[in-house]
UniProtKB/Swiss-Prot annotation:
InterPro entries with a match to the protein in the record: Leu-rich_rpt, LRR-containing, LRR_dom_sf
Pfam families in the cross-refs: LRR_6
Region of interest (Disordered), residue spans: 1-29
Bias kind Acidic residues: ranges: 1-10
Keyword line: Leucine-rich repeat, Repeat
Start and stop residues of the LRR repeats: 119-140, 147-167, 176-197, 204-225, 232-253, 260-281, 288-309, 316-336
Encoding gene, per UniProt annotation: Lrrc74a
The UniProt record lists the keyword Ribosomal protein: no
Protein name: Leucine-rich repeat-containing protein 74A
Length: 479
């Protein structure tokens, strides 16, 4: 599952959404329930004195002239050189302007143009030094543009004022924007407070990336309070921040009652074993999380054991990544045995790929996978053997499938579709792994299934059978 690739939920009508949120109609009520820290007074930039306002006074001009002409006029207005790439691609759904050195005035010209644009759905503006003025132009544009759905303004050094402007916009809930990437913007504790105050009542944003910022434990407390109230977020990336035990516990406490978040990435932080304990307790209660990444968080065998307690009772988690934690064979055992003891476990992917295991572990894992055939456990290798010799695929699974379909005079597509009850060309990874291992026509083990999935998997957690046509197998059976 790729970072932030959870699809947005179907949008409700405005009346339906407001009705659903009626019990939380005031900020006072929200913050009283969450017991959040005192709010930061928000001083909006004075619009009259701001050089970032979208200044074309004749609003009809936004819609009466072509996009190219409007952009050229906007560039002339703000005094910047037009970007040829933008002109060539302004009718495409994805506009990638990462690393273009646009600056705040270049962003302003683009924002003026996008006010009336109906084709760009995804706007990439990473690393453009857009500053406070640039982000203000973008937020003003989003007040008018109801087509743009995804925005990336990572690595733009937005800081506190940028966070304030974004928070003001998020509180209004009046755009189609559902995916927002704010990675690497030097956001600290006060920024977290502003953003969390806005997100506590925002139901539009489904995917939020706040990785590579400077959040520590106090920010973790704000985020935990927000998660207890938020009814929109499905994916949250907080990797590469500075959360330690206090922040980890606060985050996990917020997740206990959260009913929408499916994907959480907190890798490269400092949860430690106490944070792992909080996560384990959360997994006992949470009925929504599907994907959790706690890679490189200083979690030892003790922490793995504590997470295992949650896995024994959890009925929704599918992916757990524990890569680069100091977990050994003992911790690996506790994890797979917890899954074995849970007949309702939906675990599909356990990543302990820095752990060397024993032959006895592999035998136990075989037994676990017999109960849960959708499960794949990725480990480094077998103790005493080189990594290359640890797993032998024997025969390439592609070749096995080709031989079977040739002998039975059926197409490969027909074989794959027979595995899918819906008869479609796509299938969830876990369901496919279970089906390909359990089918009796072709002897495919879990290692071969893993290789097959690598070739057919898309970034959205689905395998696409049409990808088989592009795979070539040599006479030796190698891809």
């Amino acid at each position: 599952m790729d970072d932030d690739d959870i699809e947005p939920l179907e949008y409700e009508t405005k009346d339906e959404t407001e009705a659903a949120l009626a019990p939380q109609s005031s900020e006072d009520t929200l913050y009283c329930e969450a017991e959040a820290a005192p709010s930061v007074e928000k001083e909006k930039p004075t619009r009259e004195d701001s050089e970032t306002d979208l200044e074309i006074e004749d609003t009809e001009k936004f819609f009466s002239i072509g996009q190219k002409e409007l952009y050229l006029e906007a560039c002339k207005l703000v005094g910047v050189v037009p970007v040829s790439y933008f002109i060539r691609n302004m009718e495409e759904s994805c506009m990638n302007l990462n690393h273009h050195g646009l600056g705040p005035m270049g962003i302003k010209a683009i924002a003026i143009t996008l006010v009336s644009n109906t084709t760009v759905l995804k706007l990439e503006l990473e690393d453009n030094s857009i500053q406070e003025e640039g982000i203000l132009s973008l937020m003003e544009m989003l007040h008018e543009n109801y087509y743009l759905q995804e925005l990336n303004v990572s690595d733009n050094n937005l800081g506190l004022e940028g966070a304030r402007i974004i928070s003001d916009f998020l509180q209004e809930n009046n755009s189609s924007l559902w995916k927002l990437k704010l990675s690497g913007n030097k956001f600290k504790e006060e920024c977290a407070l502003l953003l969390c105050q806005a997100l506590s009542s925002n139901y539009r944003i489904r995917s939020l990336n706040l990785s590579h910022n400077e959040f520590s434990d106090t920010a973790g407390e704000y985020l935990g309070q927000m998660l207890a109230l938020n009814v929109g977020l499905q994916s949250l990336n907080l990797s590469w921040n500075h959360f330690n035990v206090r922040g980890a516990v606060a985050l996990c406490n917020g997740l206990r009652t959260n009913v929408t978040l499916k994907k959480l990435d907190v890798s490269m932080n400092g949860f430690g074993n106490d944070g792992a304990l909080a996560l384990g307790d959360t997994l006992k209660l949470n009925s929504c999380l599907v994907y959790v990444d706690v890679s490189r968080n200083g979690i030892t065998n003790e922490g793995a054991s504590r997470i295992s307690k949650g896995l024994e009772n959890n009925e929704c988690l599918q992916v757990l990544k524990l890569f680069l934690n100091p977990v050994s064979l003992e911790g690996a055992y506790s994890l797979i045995l917890a899954i074995k003891r849970n007949p309702k476990s939906r675990m599909e992917d356990l990543d302990i790929s820095n752990v060397l295991v024993s032959e006895q572990f592999v035998k136990v894992l075989d037994g676990v996978c017999a109960i849960h055939p959708q499960l794949d456990v990725v480990y480094k290798g077998l103790q005493g053997l080189s990594t290359k010799k640890t797993v032998s695929l024997e025969t390439n699974p592609i070749k096995l499938i080709q031989n079977y379909t040739d002998q039975n005079k059926i197409s490969v597509v027909e074989f794959f579709k027979s595995l899918n009850p819906s008869g479609l060309m796509t299938m969830p990874v876990g369901d496919f792994r279970k089906a390909i291992i359990q089918q009796t026509n072709i002897p495919i083990n879990r290692y071969q299934a893993r290789e097959l999935i690598k070739k057919l998997e898309e970034k959205n957690g689905m395998v696409n059978f049409s990808g088989f046509k592009s795979l070539k197998v040599t006479a030796a059976g190698q891809l």
